[in-house]
Regions:
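Glycine-rich beta-to-alpha active-site loop
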Residues: 17, 25, 33-79, 120, ...
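Charged, glycine-interspersed solvent-exposed loop segments at helix/strand-loop junctions
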Residues: 9, 79-142
Length: 142
């Protein structure tokens, strides 16, 4: 197979979110691409909510349209359990999951983990393009 002349993956995002476990799988694929010298550019052309926001922040170069918004939050948790041990195990898994999300944002933005925890204490944080630029969630407003 011929080598790519421009080793860049462009991902255009207009997403209300999705399953975090599927997102983590996609981020792992992007890590493999990055390890092969392929750059990942993300472009928010609508909204980047929840998992879409994490994907957008993961790019090596990140753009947003001036009308775009991000929604940052730590995810949703909850289900019916029949035993206390099941509930306890699910809570432990959710804490690991939330910490993984915090780590991804803190590694790929200008927001330190402690500051992000404070910003998300009320669960959901909506940010417009200017705010995303300020916090290093995007690199450029288009």
């Amino acid at each position: 197979m011929e080598a790519f002349k421009d080793p860049v993956i462009h991902i255009y995002i207009n997403s209300c979110g999705g399953d975090a476990y599927e997102l983590f799988g996609l981020l792992s694929v992007l890590d493999v691409a990055k390890s092969k010298g392929i750059s990942v550019h993300t472009h928010v052309i609508g909204v980047a909510y929840s998992a879409g926001s994490i994907l957008a922040a993961y790019g090596d170069h990140r753009t947003m349209s001036r009308y775009s918004d991000h929604l940052l939050h730590l995810g949703c948790a909850g289900a019916e359990f029949s035993t206390f041990e099941q509930l306890k195990r699910e809570a432990e898994n959710n804490i690991k999951h939330f910490n993984k999300i915090l780590r991804i944002y803190s590694e790929h933005t200008k927001i330190p983990k402690k500051k992000l925890e404070e910003m998300l204490k009320d669960d959901k944080l909506y940010l417009d393009a200017e705010q995303c630029l300020k916090y290093g969630i995007c690199d450029e407003i288009t």
